[in-house]
Design a protein with these regions (language model features):
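E2/UBC-UEV (E2-variant) core
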Residues: 125-186, 259-264
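Short acidic, Gly/Ser-rich segments with clustered Asp/Glu that frequently serve as metal-coordination loops
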Residues: 114-120
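Intrinsically disordered, low-complexity regions enriched in proline, serine, glycine
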Residues: 120-121, 256
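Charged (Asp/Glu and Lys/Arg) segments that form or flank catalytic channels of large polymer-
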Residues: 4-99, 103-110, 184-264
Length: 264
């Protein structure tokens, strides 16, 4: 490797050639971020691992990982969807109109959180937004099951909300391809790929070949703070409206501190 270590910059290349593995490389997408010391932002290339691209790469190049972390078997998929038969979100869901959907639809969940990365425990602590996804039928530890989408320092987000809006718009672009089960003919900015580009040649072909697997966003794994900041949930810190978006309790009609059965 690397001429017995003399050329260390070539070691990764040589290792990949010897193992015949396909490297999973992050893409970049342009987002407006805050520029320190100015009231405006600048556009920067942010590294991102598109869920649909990673989904397809694992299926096509890492079948062992696919069977362990994403989809153990079509029978497991069918068993999962049978267990969701009474779930309200399943009623009139567009995937149920697809042929053999119970054996092709892979349920996924997105996890998001703000993670302290510098000055932990200090008043000047800086955090990072980390988003990842996982299959809901796979097996493994948290480290093995969760696949990174993006990580960004919270200080980069513009106060206007533009950064987050565009970030989620780009992620939705990827999730739509995951749900369609096909590569899009358009990039995340809405521009059509050229017919002679690799992206253009694979446009509207299946992510997972003849098996036709596709991903369905079926779960959100976040704490209440993240649900409020990212998805606009009812603010649990406003006690006049109640502490939880799923519960009708408040201060007056259904007092959240009154535990008598007559009040429930």
């Amino acid at each position: 490797l690397g001429n017995s270590g003399e050329l260390k910059n070539n070691m990764n290349r040589d290792l990949m050639e010897l193992t015949d593995l396909q490297a999973i490389r992050p893409s970049t997408t342009r987002l407006p971020v805050k520029k320190v010391g100015t009231p405006w932002g600048i556009y920067c290339d942010i590294s991102i691992l598109w869920p649909h691209s990673l989904f397809a790469t694992i299926f096509n190049s890492f079948q062992g990982a696919w069977c362990e972390r994403i989809c153990p078997s079509k029978d497991e998929l069918e068993k999962f969807w049978d267990s969701q038969a009474n779930h309200p979100n399943l009623k009139d869901h567009p995937m149920t109109k697809r042929a053999n959907w119970k054996r092709r639809a892979v349920p996924i969940a997105i996890h998001g959180d703000g993670v302290p990365v510098t000055g932990c425990g200090k008043s000047w602590c800086k955090s990072m937004l980390v988003l990842s996804w996982c299959s809901m039928v796979g097996h493994g530890s948290t480290l093995e099951m969760n696949f990174l989408i993006v990580s960004m320092m919270s200080a980069l987000f513009m106060k206007s909300g533009t950064t987050k809006q565009l970030l989620w718009k780009r992620i939705v672009w990827s999730l739509q391809q995951l749900f369609d089960g096909q590569w899009s003919a358009y990039d995340e900015y809405g521009a059509k790929y050229g017919d002679r580009t690799p992206e253009g040649r694979r446009a509207e072909t299946n992510l997972c070949g003849d098996d036709g697997f596709f991903g369905v966003l079926w779960g959100l794994k976040q704490d209440l703070e993240h649900l409020v900041s990212e998805f606009g949930w009812k603010d649990y810190r406003r006690l006049d409206t109640g502490p939880c978006g799923f519960c009708p309790c408040d201060v007056n009609t259904f007092p959240w501190k009154d535990f008598r059965l007559a009040k429930s």
